[in-house]
Amino acid sequence: MNPEYDYLFKLLLIGDSGVGKSCLLLRFADDSYLESYISTIGVDFKIRTVEQDGKTIKLQIWDTAGQERFRTITSSYYRGAHGIIVVYDVTDQESFNNVKQWLNEIDRYASENVNKLLVGNKCDLAENRVVSYEAGKALADEIGIPFLETSAKDATNVEKAFMTMAGEIKNRMASQPATNASKPATVQMRGQPVAQQSSCCS
């Protein structure tokens, strides 16, 4: 395995357009924030390496466009994802109502045991809030996935959201019995072959 890291996890950010997916990614990867952000066209990604429990984890985080017209492009990125973060905007009821639709997309395109996390973003805009913390938590509990509220603007829980996801995936990987597959699948990244665990075959 590449000595630079112990794990390579591919994460996907999904949710309606305008909920702040790109801002969350920018805050986590670069610790920066932009008041106005151009809508993502198709997909974009950033990489950040983190330490957790003495292990080095390389996170390849893909930011997807929320618009319907890009859905066919973005759906192909679900398949190789180890973890998917579903984001809604606490000041936008419709984005919360659409969470179940996004979860259906995961069921349709992602691998069966992919880790999921529900995130309510823009919690700094308290005066504009229309979705309560309790409503978000109740939905996450119903689905059986972790839940956090975040603010990309003031960095609330952004680090925690991505680290929670990394920890959940790492624990799942550690608890999986060793398969008798001859070799793990390999993806080529920047000229370096990277071992990638394959959890389903077509």
Curated annotation (Swiss-Prot):
Q: Which compartments is it annotated to reside in?
A: Cell membrane
Keyword Protein transport (UniProt): yes
Lipid modification S-geranylgeranyl cysteine sits where? C200, C201
Identify the GO cellular component terms for this protein: plasma membrane
- Residue ranges, annotated region (Disordered): 174-202
Chief localization: membrane
**SUPFAM superfamilies (alphabetical):** P-loop containing nucleoside triphosphate hydrolases
Biased-composition ranges for Polar residues? 174-185
One GO MF annotation is:
GTP binding
Q: How does it sit in the membrane?
A: Lipid-anchor
Q: Which Gene3D superfamilies match?
A: P-loop containing nucleotide triphosphate hydrolases
Instruction: Pinpoint motif Effector region by residue range.
Output: 37-45
Protein keywords: Cell membrane, GTP-binding, Lipoprotein, Membrane, Nucleotide-binding, Prenylation, Protein transport, Transport
Q: Which InterPro entries match?
A: P-loop_NTPase (IPR027417), Rab (IPR050227), Small_GTP-bd (IPR005225), Small_GTPase (IPR001806)
As for family, the record states:
Belongs to the small GTPase superfamily. Rab family.
Functional note? Possesses GTPase activity.
Instruction: Return the NCBIfam families for the record.
Output: small_GTP
| Name of this protein | Ras-related protein RIC1
Q: Which organism's genome codes for this protein?
A: Oryza sativa subsp. japonica
- Gene responsible for this protein: RIC1
